């Protein structure tokens, strides 16, 4: 991986087969794939690699259990396949990780539906290559695994498997792999314009945020992998505002592991038909996430008091003697999911929007 100054010098004098705008996990993956096939590739990122949504996750490589409720079976199976592939190809980055979904008293129908859903999830997982299966837990076993859960609230639970990773480390590993294949990567470079020649993007107009200098990069094709900033880059070509991406805000809070005693990660159903994760991470607990339409500054999403209170209330609904308060919160972070809004969809209802990837072939490719 060469120095930034050398990468800048190369960018000024070369014509690349592909310029990738965006240094998150999507841009890194595109660059790695293209470079491994022999293309000359340049990745441009306006801040740190992985600084956006890619570093604001719940650290999970999950198969999309909650997507089954929306009947997204094909997506769930695809996610399970990708999860198993990552575990096989990058065991130093992705490892098996188990969760417990508690069953609540007086909610027999939901408990049965959840058990059936996890059974289907296991079936999809097995067809994707995993051999493990879920396990039903009685109240005593669940109490030993997660003492903070109230025995008057929960009646047992079910244990299932997913995977976990360090999201930022994952991005940097893929970036470095792309470099090993010959890609050039530069951070702190802002894209200010896209020049067209014969109906195709031929130059990317850039601004070095360190030196303040402007320069252009010649290319044969360009990929916009900027997540929630997708529309900003697309509009550099079209010249007119067009909304393809709807940002959905996901907030997490962090509390000390001593504040809520659990020896396992939890997958908590909520009263508003969502799910909240409680994930042990680096001697602390991450609790999240929310899923709400966002209209604020996409460059600096912050957790709000209402969002933190919501997450606290979900966890507290499962406990009695280990109730959490704002005083227990040692940190928080928020990220924005770039969801594709299809014609006729309600932008406010982000939880119903598909998590599938779509590729738009814009004028100027």
Predicted regions and their residues:
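Dinucleotide-binding Rossmann-like beta1-alpha1 core, especially the glycine-rich loop
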Residues: 59-145
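Extreme N-terminal leader/targeting segments of oxidoreductases
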Residues: 1-18, 33-37
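Flavin (primarily FAD) binding-site architecture
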Residues: 224-239
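Core beta-strand elements of the Rossmann-like FAD/NAD(P) dinucleotide-binding domain
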Residues: 14-16, 211-221
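Helix-loop-beta segment of a Rossmann-like dinucleotide-binding subdomain
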Residues: 143-182, 203-205, 213-217, 290-299, ...
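A conserved short coil-to-beta-strand element within the FAD-binding core of flavoproteins
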Residues: 187-202
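C-terminal catalytic lobe of FAD-dependent flavoproteins
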Residues: 177, 235, 240-286, 292-365
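Glycine-rich FAD pyrophosphate-binding loop
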Residues: 35-56
């Amino acid at each position: 991986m060469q120095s930034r100054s050398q990468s800048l010098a190369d960018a000024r004098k070369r014509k690349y087969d592909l310029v990738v705008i965006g240094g998150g996990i999507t841009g890194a993956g595109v660059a790695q794939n293209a470079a491994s096939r022999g293309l000359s590739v340049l990745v441009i990122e306006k801040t740190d690699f992985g600084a956006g949504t890619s570093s604001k996750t719940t650290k999970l490589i999950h198969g999309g259990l909650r997507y089954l409720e929306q009947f997204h079976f094909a997506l769930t199976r695809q996610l399970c396949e990708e999860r198993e592939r990552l575990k096989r190809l990058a065991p130093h980055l992705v490892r098996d990780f188990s969760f417990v979904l508690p069953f609540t008293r007086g909610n027999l129908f939901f408990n049965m539906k959840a058990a059936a859903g996890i059974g289907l999830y296991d079936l999809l997982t097995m067809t994707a290559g995993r051999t493990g299966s879920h396990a039903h837990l009685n109240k005593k076993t669940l109490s030993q695994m997660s003492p903070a859960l109230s025995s008057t609230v929960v009646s047992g639970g079910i244990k299932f498997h997913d995977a976990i990773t360090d999201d930022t480390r994952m991005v940097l590993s893929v970036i470095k792999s792309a470099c090993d294949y010959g890609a050039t990567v530069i951070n702190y470079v802002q894209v200010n314009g896209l020049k067209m020649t014969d109906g195709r993007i031929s130059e990317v107009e850039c601004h070095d945020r360190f030196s303040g200098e402007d320069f252009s990069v010649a290319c044969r094709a360009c990929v916009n992998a900027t997540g929630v900033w997708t529309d900003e880059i697309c509009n550099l070509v079209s010249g007119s505002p067009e909304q393809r991406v709807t940002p959905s805000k996901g907030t997490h809070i962090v509390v000390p592991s001593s504040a809520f005693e659990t020896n396992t990660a939890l997958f908590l159903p909520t009263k508003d038909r969502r799910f909240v994760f409680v994930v042990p991470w680096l001697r602390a607990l991450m609790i999240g996430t929310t899923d709400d339409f966002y209209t604020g500054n996409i460059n600096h999403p912050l957790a709000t008091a209402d969002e933190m209170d919501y997450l606290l209330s979900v966890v507290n609904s499962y406990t009695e003697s280990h109730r959490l308060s704002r005083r227990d919160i040692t940190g928080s972070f928020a990220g924005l999911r770039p969801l594709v809004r299809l014609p006729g969809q309600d932008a406010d209802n982000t939880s119903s929007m598909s998590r599938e990837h779509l590729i738009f072939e814009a004028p100027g490719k």
